[in-house]
Amino acid sequence: MSLLTEVETLTRNGWGCRCSDSSDPLVVAASIIGILHLILWILDRLFFKCIYRRFKYGLKRGPSTEGVPESMREEYRQEQQNAVDVDDGHFVNIELE
């Protein structure tokens, strides 16, 4: 059995689609999956900047600070900031001739 069940043929009324076994559950499932795939692909292309920005930046939050005293939260923020601040003396400048 072939999954290619739609055949366009020239009929008396013009070009038409003759579907064989269109009530086959496999054909119905494949059609539904194909339509859902197309819809998801279109949505992905329309909103890819929002979606991937959310994954890139939204999931990079620090650990939860729920239940931690404010002084410890501030200390943690300061440690994170110090880890980001880098002394320029650690880098080597290479000049190409």
Swiss-Prot record:
The keyword Cell cycle does not apply. One of its GO terms (cellular component) is host cell plasma membrane. Cytoplasmic tail plays an important role in virion assembly and morphogenesis. Residues 1-22 are virion surface. The modification Phosphoserine is found at S64. This is Matrix protein 2. Homotetramer; composed of two disulfide-linked dimers held together by non-covalent interactions. May interact with matrix protein 1. One of its GO terms (biological process) is symbiont-mediated suppression of host autophagy. One of its GO terms (molecular function) is identical protein binding. The record marks H37 as: Essential for channel activity, possibly by being protonated during channel activation, and by forming the channel gate and the selective filter. Forms a proton-selective ion channel that is necessary for the efficient release of the viral genome during virus entry. After attaching to the cell surface, the virion enters the cell by endocytosis. Acidification of the endosome triggers M2 ion channel activity. The record marks W41 as: Seems to be involved in pH gating. The M2 protein from most influenza A strains is inhibited by amantadine and rimantadine, resulting in viral uncoating incapacity. Emergence of amantadine-resistant variants is usually rapid. It holds the Pfam family Flu_M2. It is a single-pass type III membrane protein. Belongs to the influenza viruses matrix protein M2 family. It comes from Influenza A virus (strain A/Hong Kong/156/1997 H5N1 genotype Gs/Gd). Residues 44-97 are intravirion.
